[in-house]
């Protein structure tokens, strides 16, 4: 079965091309590229970790929807935070998106792109 690229490449801040697919389906698995708190205009959501976590999770939900998936289909999540002091605030907001139980997850500290406080990628399982 061929790999299906879902969505179109986006433009980031300053009109910079972002050369990756938002999602890729490989068989029954859907891989969502790392999402940050990027608004439609390519700018990062202003504000702290609360606003950026919500925007990032909403972006994940939107890309999942383009692939015919929901958060219920997510099997694994990888999270990068630029400041570990934000963990508990992030965690509370993150948990609200998974009221029926959260998927497997890893969370690490990482230097992220300018102004981004969080990045999230996911792997979903959704049989064709």
What are these regions (language model features)?
Residues 1-58, 62-75, 81-128:
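N-terminal presequence-like segments and the immediate start of the first folded domain
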């Amino acid at each position: 079965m061929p790999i299906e690229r879902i969505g179109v490449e986006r433009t980031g801040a300053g009109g910079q091309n972002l050369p990756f697919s938002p999602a890729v389906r490989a068989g029954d698995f859907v891989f969502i590229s790392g999402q940050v708190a990027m608004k439609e205009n390519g700018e990062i959501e202003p504000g702290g970790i609360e606003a950026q976590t919500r925007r990032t999770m909403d972006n994940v939900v939107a890309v999942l929807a383009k692939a015919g998936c929901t958060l219920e289909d997510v099997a694994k999540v990888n999270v990068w935070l630029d400041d570990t002091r934000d963990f508990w605030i992030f965690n509370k907001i993150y948990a609200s998106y998974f009221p029926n139980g959260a998927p497997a997850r890893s969370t690490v500290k990482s230097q992220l792109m300018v102004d981004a406080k969080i990045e999230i990628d996911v792997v979903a399982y959704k049989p064709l």
